[in-house]
């Protein structure tokens, strides 16, 4: 024992400087072996990519956080240099190939969601977008699927039209007061007040809120978007935020606790109404919360946490994505007067209702309106980044590169939407491309594909049909301090532009 002690004492450094040298040497050796292993002995060692991306996670961290969410924009240049199959980080592969997108994300795909991404960044593990297990996801989605069918949209359309009418009134007020209109915030009001009707048959009256106010919901949405990649790289921050003293957490994530409290109150209110035998909205509709509390298939109700997570998720997913698309569509159309006039000409002969508004059933099939919306969706790509999946047990080979089981793979929506082989001049707003080639619909992947596609896509389409048709024929607008620079976006889970789209309502259209 004494001999062993002497050996240890002789080996250990005797001074602080020697200790520092030992620690530095150990760290250096560890780092070198880690880099060597990832470059030459890793299952993905033969996949091409930048040296730093293949060897260190810090490369992705740098793109996501230091440079502010621009990795998805840099994929094109990297793929041009390294080929269609790119090692974007030590354990993740990005593929720039629209056919690969459909291979991975379409119905019947064996590629499961990557839990390291979907379970980590959102903090809502029981919400549909975060559920990894395919069968559990199928059962959960089935509970509410009928609410989002085309038939259900007809029943909901009169409520959405009322919301749009209220927003138009707000735009009229800005015209009369000669005030600049933050139309992106107004569109956000349309989407929030609509999704609240779907969730729990109520409205937050966001359209009527003062522009200088930031309600708890918006504060939460902004904070989450600004910190999306920080939470992705350091998911422990979510746990910390939810477990530190409330007084501190409220400063770090403003609005979060107030919004969560509102959600819980909505759930309790609906549960109380169920106990009194009231299980539908006043107009006979069932809401998302209704069906989650009392499934129509006779199954067990979800836990309170699951209902809360689902409600939270719907509120987020159903708000920014659509308002961003409508805002950017407004920017594109106001920047192209001839195309805006073409849209107005198509709408002019369409009959309006007694309130002088276009209805969903009369405009949803108009070719040029659809083309304008599709082009707005393509160019704005509200969720532009990666949605990783895991290669199934049998592995796969793509473009000569073998990807072993469990590899995290992705193909970003933005990469598909800007592929010049499919969309010539992808940076230009050309609605006519959708009229000339019906096959392009296959490559409009903004809502995803298959059983994992966005469940609320019909709601988003309806909101946009009603907003575009009524706003562009009721108002004459010009852009205010909104241009290519102000609408430049970064990936924050959602696409976030530098400044909101703002307009002046010059006159009311006759």
Curated annotation (Swiss-Prot):
User: Sorted alphabetically, which keywords does the UniProt record give?
Assistant: Glycoprotein, Heme, Iron, Membrane, Metal-binding, Monooxygenase, Oxidoreductase, Transmembrane, Transmembrane helix, Virulence
What EC numbers are recorded for this enzyme? 1.-.-.-
Which cellular compartments is it found in?
Membrane
Any idea what a deletion of this gene does?
Abolishes the production of 10-beta,15-alpha-dihydroxyprobotryane, botrydial, and of some of its relatives.
**Annotated transmembrane regions:** 16-36
Pathway noted in the entry? Secondary metabolite biosynthesis
Q: Which residues are glycosylated?
A: 476
Name one matching Pfam family: p450
Q: Does the keyword Cytoplasm apply?
A: no
Q: Which cofactor does it need?
A: heme
Q: Where does heme bind?
A: 454
The molecular function terms of the Gene Ontology recorded here are: heme binding; iron ion binding; monooxygenase activity; oxidoreductase activity, acting on paired donors, with incorporation or reduction of molecular oxygen
Q: Name the domain of life this protein comes from.
A: Eukaryota
Q: Give GO cellular component annotations, separated by semicolons.
A: membrane
The protein's induction, as recorded, is:
The botrydial biosynthesis cluster genes are co-regulated by the Ca(2+)/calcineurin signal transduction pathway, which is under the control of the alpha subunit BCG1 of a heterotrimeric G protein. Expression of the cluster is also positively regulated by the cluster-specific transcription factor BOT6.
Q: How does it sit in the membrane?
A: Single-pass membrane protein
Q: Which family does it belong to?
A: Belongs to the cytochrome P450 family.
Query: Which purpose does this protein serve, as stated in its record?
Result: Cytochrome P450 monooxygenase; part of the gene cluster that mediates the biosynthesis of botrydial. Botrydial is necessary for colonization of plant tissue by the T4 strain. It is a strain-dependent virulence factor since highly aggressive strains like SAS56 or B05 still retain substantial virulence when botrydial synthesis is impaired, since they produce also botcinic acid. The first step of botrydial biosynthesis is performed by the sesquiterpene synthase BOT2 which catalyzes the cyclization of farnesyl diphosphate (FPP) to presilphiperfolan-8-beta-ol (PSP).
Q: What is this protein called?
A: Cytochrome P450 monooxygenase BOT1
Organism the protein comes from: Botryotinia fuckeliana
């Amino acid at each position: 024992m004494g001999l062993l002690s002497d050996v240890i004492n002789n080996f250990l450094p005797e001074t602080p400087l020697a200790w520092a040298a030992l620690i530095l040497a150990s760290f250096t050796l560890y780092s070198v072996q880690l880099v060597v292993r990832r470059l030459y002995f890793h299952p993905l060692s033969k996949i091409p990519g930048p040296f730093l991306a293949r060897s260190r996670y810090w490369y992705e961290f740098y793109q996501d956080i230091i440079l502010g969410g621009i990795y998805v924009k840099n994929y094109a240049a990297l793929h041009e240099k390294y080929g269609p199959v790119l090692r974007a980080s030590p354990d993740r592969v990005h593929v720039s190939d629209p056919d690969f997108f459909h291979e991975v994300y379409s119905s019947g795909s064996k590629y499961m969601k990557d839990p390291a991404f979907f379970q980590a960044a959102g903090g809502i593990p029981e919400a549909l977008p975060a559920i990894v297990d395919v069968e559990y996801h199928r059962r959960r989605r089935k509970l509410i699927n009928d609410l989002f069918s085309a038939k259900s949209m007809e029943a909901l359309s009169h409520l959405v039209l009322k919301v749009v009418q209220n927003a138009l009134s707000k735009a009229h007020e800005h015209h009369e007061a000669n005030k600049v209109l933050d139309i992106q915030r107004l569109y956000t009001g349309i989407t929030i007040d609509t999704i609240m009707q779907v969730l729990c048959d109520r409205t937050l009256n966001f359209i009527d809120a003062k522009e200088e106010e930031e309600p708890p919901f918006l504060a939460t949405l902004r904070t989450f978007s600004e910190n999306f990649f920080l939470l992705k790289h350091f998911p422990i921050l979510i746990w910390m935020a939810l477990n530190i003293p409330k007084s501190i957490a409220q400063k770090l994530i403003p609005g979060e606790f107030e919004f969560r409290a509102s959600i819980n109150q909505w759930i309790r209110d609906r549960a109380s109404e169920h106990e009194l035998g009231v299980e539908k909205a006043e107009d006979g509709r069932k809401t998302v919360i209704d069906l989650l509390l009392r499934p129509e298939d006779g199954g067990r109700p979800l836990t309170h946490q699951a209902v809360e997570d689902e409600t939270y998720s719907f509120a987020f997913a159903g708000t920014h994505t659509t308002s961003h698309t409508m805002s950017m569509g407004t920017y594109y159309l106001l920047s192209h007067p001839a195309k805006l006039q073409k849209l107005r000409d198509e709408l002019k002969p369409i009959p309006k209702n007694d309130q002088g508004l276009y209805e969903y059933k009369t405009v949803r099939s108009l070719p040029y309106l659809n083309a304008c919306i599709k082009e707005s969706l393509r160019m704005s790509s509200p969720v532009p980044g990666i949605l990783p999946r895991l290669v199934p047990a049998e592995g796969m080979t793509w473009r000569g590169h073998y990807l072993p089981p469990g590899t995290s793979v992705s193909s970003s929506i933005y990469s598909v939407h800007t592929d010049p082989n499919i969309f010539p001049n992808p940076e230009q707003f050309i609605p006519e491309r959708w009229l000339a080639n019906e096959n392009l619909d296959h490559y409009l992947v903004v809502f995803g594909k298959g059983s994992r596609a966005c469940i609320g896509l019909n709601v988003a389409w309806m909101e946009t049909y009603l907003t575009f048709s009524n706003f562009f024929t009721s108002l004459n607008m010009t852009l205010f301090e909104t241009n290519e620079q102000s609408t430049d976006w970064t990936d924050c889970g959602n696409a976030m532009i530098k400044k909101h789209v703002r307009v002046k309502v010059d006159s009311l259209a006759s």
